A protein has these predicted regions:
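General marker for long, soluble alpha-helical cores
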Residues: 1-180
């Protein structure tokens, strides 16, 4: 299925007996967050953007829904609200390779180390809020992604008994951060 975002949004706003499973190509570069969200909700198939560089801006919930699934976006993304969570940011980070800007950098994040790694491995603005790692199965790679200059907030490990093994430089980087 291929067409401009407005036409595809109209198609997917209709009620179908079954969810569309085929690929969808958005052929124009004038799509917006609302249209991308509607198209993504209407298909389980891969979404291909002819213009992957369109900037998107909106609240984290809408951005996560627009960028969920298989999509090839690489434009800038701005999260405008201060109510985002780890799940939403992980979906956004998984859906774009573009720069992610947090308008409110102070929001506390709490979640699984692998989701936090997904977020902080992306090109994201420096986060200044507290970060809590909630699982007890984190590793050096995950902690390094969280601690490697992407956040200046205090990092809390809910389980601080996990044994860590790794390169001395990586461990030094991790432990140079502020832990609660």
């Amino acid at each position: 299925l291929s067409g401009d975002a407005t036409d595809l949004t109209t198609i997917f706003s209709e009620t179908f007996a079954a969810t569309h499973n085929g690929g969808v190509t958005i052929t124009d570069g004038a799509y917006n967050l609302s249209e991308l969200k509607s198209v993504n909700a209407g298909t389980r198939g891969e979404i291909t953007l002819s213009d992957r560089t369109v900037a998107l801006s909106g609240d984290a919930t809408d951005l996560a829904l627009a960028l969920a699934g298989t999509i090839n976006h690489n434009g800038a993304v701005t999260v405008t609200d201060g109510a985002y969570n780890v799940s939403e940011l992980a979906a956004i980070a998984g859906g774009t390779s573009g720069a992610i800007t947090l308008n409110d950098k102070t929001v506390a994040l709490s979640g699984d180390a692998s989701d936090l790694k997904t977020i902080f491995d992306e090109n994201i603005t420096k986060h200044t809020g507290a970060v809590t790692v909630t699982d007890g199965s984190y590793n050096v790679s995950e902690l390094l992604s969280i601690a490697n200059g992407k956040t200046s907030g205090t990092i809390t490990l809910d389980d601080n008994t996990v044994a860590l093994s790794g390169d001395a430089t990586d461990l030094t980087t991790i432990f140079s951060e502020t832990f609660a």
